[in-house]
UniProtKB/Swiss-Prot annotation:
Localization (cell): Cell membrane
Catalytic machinery residues: 287
Cofactor(s) this protein requires: prenylated FMN; Mn(2+)
Keyword RNA-binding applies: no
Name recorded for this polypeptide: 3-octaprenyl-4-hydroxybenzoate carboxy-lyase
GO biological process, one term: ubiquinone biosynthetic process
Keyword annotations from UniProtKB, A to Z: Cell membrane, Decarboxylase, Flavoprotein, FMN, Lyase, Manganese, Membrane, Metal-binding, Ubiquinone biosynthesis
Pfam families according to UniProt: UbiD, UbiD_C, UbiD_N
Job of this protein: Catalyzes the decarboxylation of 3-octaprenyl-4-hydroxy benzoate to 2-octaprenylphenol, an intermediate step in ubiquinone biosynthesis.
Length: 488
């Protein structure tokens, strides 16, 4: 089922028993985090806090707190269906030339559907029903969460940041946390390789000293939100991909103060600029690692205008030691990644990002090994093929008789098929997440690959052990007798 906007999604979740309205006053300061954390760990529903303490605007939390709700937001009926979305993205990322006329005709509907999902620009939008400008702008009117005791200030977490570089026709959508430092100022924490930061850098080079337009959409429809965190090919905009997920074109509206276009059905829009050179220290904040991050300097976003729907809903989350909402998103999006990787590396059978590994810092790959050194080729491919795995510190590669999602299997493979010196690959001075304080230098560290596959001639001179396999006939006979044995 597809959802036109966030409110439509809320109604759909409520009908399925997947959303709970909270009538008891709960504070955005620490209390919402506690409630959402307990609910997420219990695999509970999305939560709509209708009476946040001190505010008139309700807060939506734990929206994507289960993989099933992520799938629903992407228009799928099950997590397994996300593999089909991954296959579509794999095709669009590297489309193969048609093998003949029949093949060309079979692929034509896909391209026609993609073209037909180009965003639609509208003149009037519900996200601009109310306009607040100038001195009336006050972020303190929004129920922005203060998530952890050691956090320095309230933090905007689910904002879709919209930017456009000076040499680009296409806008970039990114989700970057934003620390509130005044009634109309937040710190835009984007890492240097992310799309928004690249757009800003190019703008400063081409338009030195000129303010850089930025917009932030809060409470967009689920397809647009999830499109911003999915590995969409560079040839496809996040808005067009959201249209594919939703089944109809994404409606956009021009900002009141710039040429940027924002989701027309969003709940709240922040419009403004970044003045080149205006920076501020950001943090510390509790993060998805389970630790408070270091303080670092990032650009300041000045909010010149807030537009919103009548009676808006504020969408929020928290990040902390897994499981948290980003970790659950990672579990679901894992299914999207698998077909994309298999398109490039057909030998890959499964790919798993354990959520306890902070969603991306460790990957387990199972493969059909075909030659000596094959596992090392795959691990290097994982690090280099998709930018989403640039910060993956550990890659474990095993044979296809191992279940990548079962640590009992994986640890058995590591301890029985690896020699630590021969089968460990270490790479120095590679890009590492800036939040990773374990690396010796901020943003630069090492990576480890573990080859836990059976070793082929050339990789070892010893006779390799044979895996114990039960006798199938005996297993069937004992299955038939089992109830008679009286063993509980």
């Amino acid at each position: 089922m597809q959802y036109r906007d966030l409110r439509d999604f809320i109604r759909g979740l409520e009908q399925r028993g997947e959303l709970k309205r909270i009538q008891v006053p709960i504070s955005p300061v620490l209390e919402m985090t506690e409630v959402c954390d307990r609910t997420l760990r219990a695999k509970g529903p999305a939560l709509l806090f209708e009476k946040p303490t001190g505010f008139d605007i309700p807060v939506l939390g734990n929206l994507f707190g289960t993989p099933e709700r992520v799938a629903m937001g992407m228009g799928a009926e099950s997590v397994e269906e996300l593999r089909e979305i991954g296959k579509l993205l794999a095709f669009l990322k590297e489309p193969e030339p048609p093998k003949g006329l029949k093949d060309a005709w079979s692929k034509l509907p896909i391209f026609k559907k993609v073209v037909s999902m180009a965003p639609k620009v509208v003149k009037d939008a519900v996200c601009q029903e109310v306009v607040v400008e100038g001195d009336d702008v006050d972020l303190g009117q929004l129920p922005i969460q203060h998530c952890w005791p050691g956090d320095v200030a309230p933090l905007i977490t689910w904002g879709l940041t919209v930017t456009r570089g000076p040499n680009k026709d296409r806008q970039n959508l990114g989700i970057y946390r934003q620390q509130v430092i005044g009634r109309n100022k937040v710190i835009m924490r984007w890492l240097s390789h992310r799309g928004g930061a690249l757009d800003y850098r190019e703008w400063c080079e081409k338009n030195p000293g000129q303010p850089f337009p930025v917009a932030v959409a809060l409470g967009a429809d689920p397809a647009t939100i999830l499109g911003a965190v999915t590995p969409v090919p560079d040839t496809l905009s996040e808005y067009a991909f959201a249209g594919l997920l939703r089944g109809n074109r994404t409606e956009l509206v021009k900002c009141r103060g710039s040429n940027l276009q924002v989701p027309a059905t969003a709940e709240i829009i922040l419009e403004g600029v970044i003045h080149p050179g205006e920076m501020a220290p950001e943090g510390p904040y509790g993060d998805h690692t389970g630790y408070y991050n270091e303080v670092d300097s990032f650009p300041v976003f000045t909010v010149e205008r807030i537009t919103h729907r009548q009676k808006p809903i504020y969408h929020s989350t928290y990040t902390g030691r897994p499981p948290d909402e980003p970790a659950i998103l990672g579990v679901a999006l894992n299914e999207v990644f698998v077909p994309i990787l298999q398109k490039q590396f057909p030998e890959i059978v499964d790919f798993y990002l354990p959520p306890e590994g902070c969603s991306y810092r460790m990957a387990v790959v199972t493969m059909k090994k075909q030659y000596p050194g094959h596992a090392k080729r795959v691990m290097l491919g994982v690090w280099s093929f998709l930018r989403q795995f640039m910060y993956t510190k550990f890659v474990i590669v095993t044979d296809d008789d191992i279940n990548a999602r079962d640590w009992n299997d994986v640890i058995w493979a590591i301890t029985t098929r690896m020699d630590p010196k021969r089968d460990t690959v270490m790479i120095d001075n590679t890009p590492i997440d800036y939040l990773d304080f374990a690396s010796p230098v901020s943003g630069l560290g090492s990576k480890m690959g573990l080859d836990a596959t059976h070793k082929w001639p050339g990789e070892t001179t010893r006779e390799w052990g044979r895996v114990i396999v039960k006798d199938e006939a005996v297993t069937r006979r004992i299955d038939e007798l089992w109830d008679q044995l009286g063993i509980d």
